[in-house]
């Protein structure tokens, strides 16, 4: 193998080509590759962050759902307590009203009883006076006197 000018020219041309590629072609290629690697790494990092954000959002949504259920249960419990309180108040009010009506009825009965007693006293007094008058008119006759008393007793 002989080294001639052609081989030497080809070697120099190859070295110039390598130098040119290293100087002008290789850096943009490396920059493009590095930029692509950076984009891929950023995309993977963003995907990881998105997955974490999704997980956090799911946890937060679960917590909010638990809080909402707890709040709903608390509201239902308060409503049930209020319902029981209203029912108890209505029972107490009804018992009070019933007692009031019963007391009013007893008072009316007592008033009617007193009125009837008073009427009866007046009638007894009138009968006693009438009997006394009749006895005085017939005071001589004992049999008539006893008959009048018996009639008074029967009328009472």
Swiss-Prot record:
Amino-acid biosynthesis is among the record's keywords: no
Subcellular location per the Swiss-Prot or TrEMBL entry: Cell inner membrane
Family matches, as SUPFAM superfamilies: F1F0 ATP synthase subunit B, membrane domain (SSF81573)
Predominant location category: membrane
Transmembrane stretches, start-end: 7-29
GO cellular component: plasma membrane; proton-transporting ATP synthase complex
Record's keyword annotation contains Nucleotide-binding: no
Gene3D superfamilies, per database record: F1F0 ATP synthase subunit B, membrane domain (1.20.5.620)
Bilayer topology: Single-pass membrane protein
GO function term, MF aspect, one: proton-transporting ATP synthase activity, rotational mechanism
Keyword entries, A-Z: ATP synthesis, Cell inner membrane, Cell membrane, CF(0), Hydrogen ion transport, Ion transport, Membrane, Transmembrane, Transmembrane helix, Transport
InterPro entries xref list: ATP_synth_B-like_membr_sf, ATP_synth_b/b'su_bac/chlpt, ATP_synth_F0_bsu_bac, ATP_synthase_B_chain
Function (record text): F(1)F(0) ATP synthase produces ATP from ADP in the presence of a proton or sodium gradient. F-type ATPases consist of two structural domains, F(1) containing the extramembraneous catalytic core and F(0) containing the membrane proton channel, linked together by a central stalk and a peripheral stalk. During catalysis, ATP synthesis in the catalytic domain of F(1) is coupled via a rotary mechanism of the central stalk subunits to proton translocation. Component of the F(0) channel, it forms part of the peripheral stalk, linking F(1) to F(0).
Subunit structure: F-type ATPases have 2 components, F(1) - the catalytic core - and F(0) - the membrane proton channel. F(1) has five subunits: alpha(3), beta(3), gamma(1), delta(1), epsilon(1). F(0) has three main subunits: a(1), b(2) and c(10-14). The alpha and beta chains form an alternating ring which encloses part of the gamma chain. F(1) is attached to F(0) by a central stalk formed by the gamma and epsilon chains, while a peripheral stalk is formed by the delta and b chains.
Annotated HAMAP family: ATP_synth_b_bprime (MF_01398)
Family statement: Belongs to the ATPase B chain family.
Protein's recorded name: ATP synthase subunit b
């Amino acid at each position: 193998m002989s080294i001639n000018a052609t081989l030497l020219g080809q070697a120099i041309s190859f070295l110039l080509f390598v130098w040119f590629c290293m100087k002008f072609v290789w850096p943009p290629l490396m920059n493009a590759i590095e930029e692509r690697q950076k984009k891929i790494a950023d995309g993977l990092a963003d995907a990881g962050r998105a997955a974490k954000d999704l997980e956090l959002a799911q946890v937060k949504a679960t917590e909010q759902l638990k809080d909402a259920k707890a709040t709903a249960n608390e509201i239902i419990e308060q409503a049930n307590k209020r319902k029981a309180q209203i029912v108890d108040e209505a029972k107490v009010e009804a018992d009070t009203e019933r007692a009031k009506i019963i007391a009013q009825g007893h008072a009316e009965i007592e008033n009617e009883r007193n009125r009837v007693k008073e009427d009866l006293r007046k009638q007894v007094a009138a009968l006693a006076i009438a009997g006394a008058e009749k006895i005085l008119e017939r005071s001589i006759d004992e049999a008539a006197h006893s008959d009048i008393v018996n009639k008074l007793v029967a009328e009472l």
